[in-house]
């Protein structure tokens, strides 16, 4: 019954979603009880797609339940229609989306990895040694990005763009330089 009444609404929302300029996506494990032909402990996946206030579409969150984490799910969901920016984590499936979709990374996901590294390093490093690590320096730079975003939160999209170009872009370039330099040093 729910499928009969809600599926048409979901499809209309998805059409609107696919017309947006900016979208976000993520996937998470879901344990489903009494799924046909599966054990109760089987992990399935909820793929989540959302628009935000800058997307050019109404704000919405769409959920797509799948039995696997296979990379074709976001490709199928976005279909031949979506064309714009898609913010997501580093999961490889998103990076195999068609070229008409510009994949952008999520700073919160990147930050989480550096924070996890710091948690491990804190066991064996002094505070002074920690400050020299790439993880610490990356966290400090990410903190600066967050401060910039907080300062420009209430500005128009055009004003935010200008401020990001002026303030965040040089920081981002330095951030990537730090990571590339660190990566090259780790290879030697």
Protein language model features and the residues they cover:
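A conserved active-site cap/scaffold subdomain adjacent to cofactor or substrate pockets
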Residues: 118, 130-149
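Conserved protein kinase catalytic core
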Residues: 32, 95, 115
